Regions:
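Hydrophobic alpha-helical segments involved in membrane association or supramolecular assembly
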Residues: 1-401
Length: 401
């Protein structure tokens, strides 16, 4: 627990949660809200006095007043500070002057939820890339989907990759069935085409304002990708994978993406190697289709299109819905619920104060709802673990086959 502040854990929306607490502190600290409390208390007192007079039970009025004074003195007058901790970015924002009636129970519930989530993930023993608290739901699956869709985004990278594949790779796989099969089974296409004799050294290609043999062009392409294309793709991946870290996205992704690919595909390579492989996997079918269209081989073009659609079908079926749900629906729905429940506290407190002895029932219903909303984190961590390990086996079998 932060010194002189109660911890409240947020998941990827720490700034917004801190704004919510700040707004709540401002609302409950205004004279207008205090005037509203006074009006509600007086109206409740009048109703309680009328009820006690009708029933000839003056003791009920005394109990009602005592309950109202206790609720106000215990839940509203004392103030605490809340330290909003964003689990993923590790940012901490302290918000002052939060009423004890919402600050303390919300902090206790949030810390209990975070402890449960961490306990489950520690017991599961997965790497960081598979942890819900680190990267969100289905991160390894989202990595596979994203890497399959990687395409060059810089002009130099796109031109160099297109020229090389069209001049040096496509002729080889069309003329030699053995090389075509090697390319299909290669875990590292760049390493394969760089081997001595795989590309024809007699062929020439124009790349980076130079005419190079295919052997020379393979090395030149590798340098171009490492210098311009891969750094640009690394920054783009932060947006596609919804990853944002205070210590830098490159450091986070350079570790997480190899871990995710190791889990789902059973391969071990660096992030740069993964991006090079993905670029080649997307460039070769595209260039083959372009080449087929140029030479008028419609059956070849249709065959490439069918092969691509079949290869992507499993990924589309298994991961598109899940990744979209993980990236947008679940976090938004959960954030709306949390914001609504916490933001309603000023109104709930008015009802607690106005009902006097009935405030306990209002309090119980409200905090039951708050506990239910807070349980989403450990439950989602369990669902993430089950989903990940259910997908691991078929994906590894698909790759190994």
């Amino acid at each position: 627990m932060t010194t002189e502040a109660l911890d409240f854990y947020a998941y990827w929306n720490g700034a917004q949660v801190a704004d919510l607490w700040t707004t709540l502190a401002l609302i409950t600290g205004t004279d207008d809200y205090r005037s509203l409390l006074l009006c509600v208390a007086l109206f409740g007192l009048i109703c309680a006095a009328a009820g006690a007079a009708v029933r000839y039970r003056g003791g009920d009025l005394i109990v009602w007043i005592a309950a109202m004074v206790f609720i106000f003195s215990a839940a509203f007058v004392p103030r605490v500070n809340i330290a909003v901790r964003d689990v993923r970015s590790a940012n901490v924002q302290v918000v002052q002057n939060i009423p004890l009636g919402i600050g303390w129970p919300a902090s206790v519930i949030s810390r209990a939820s975070y402890w449960l989530t961490e306990s489950f993930e520690t017991a599961f023993g997965d790497v960081d890339a598979a942890r819900y608290t680190r990267f969100g739901v289905a991160f390894p699956q989202r990595v596979v989907t994203t890497m399959l869709s990687v395409k060059p985004i810089t002009a130099d990278g796109k031109m160099s990759l297109t020229n090389f594949t069209e001049r040096c790779i496509v002729p080889e796989i069309l003329e030699n069935s053995v090389k075509r099969q090697e390319l299909l089974n290669a875990p590292d296409i760049n390493a394969l085409i760089s081997t001595n004799g795989w590309v024809n050294p007699a062929r020439r290609v124009f790349m980076n304002n130079k005419v190079l043999t295919c052997t020379e062009a393979a090395e030149e392409l590798k340098k171009t990708l490492e210098k311009t294309e891969i750094p640009a793709l690394e920054s783009r991946l932060r947006l596609k994978l919804n990853v944002d870290f205070k210590d830098g996205v490159n450091a986070a992704l350079s570790t997480a993406i190899p871990q995710a690919e190791s889990i789902m595909l059973g391969v071990s390579r660096t992030m740069a190697e993964s991006l090079r492989q993905s670029l080649m996997m997307s460039a070769i079918p595209d260039t083959t289709m372009t080449f087929a269209a140029k030479v008028g081989q419609a059956p070849l073009s249709a065959g490439v299109a069918i092969a691509r659609s079949q290869g992507n079908l499993a990924s589309e079926i298994n991961y598109r819905t899940l990744s979209e749900m993980a990236r947008s629906a679940l976090p938004k729905l959960r954030n709306i619920l949390e914001f609504t429940v916490i933001g309603l506290w000023p109104m709930v407190f008015l009802m607690m104060l106005g009902t006097g002895t009935g405030g306990a029932m209002v309090c119980r219903a409200y905090f039951t709802l708050l506990i239910s909303v807070s349980l989403w984190a450990p439950i989602t961590a369990i669902i993430n673990y089950l989903t990940l390990h259910l997908d691991m086996e078929p994906m590894n079998q698909l790759v190994n086959s």
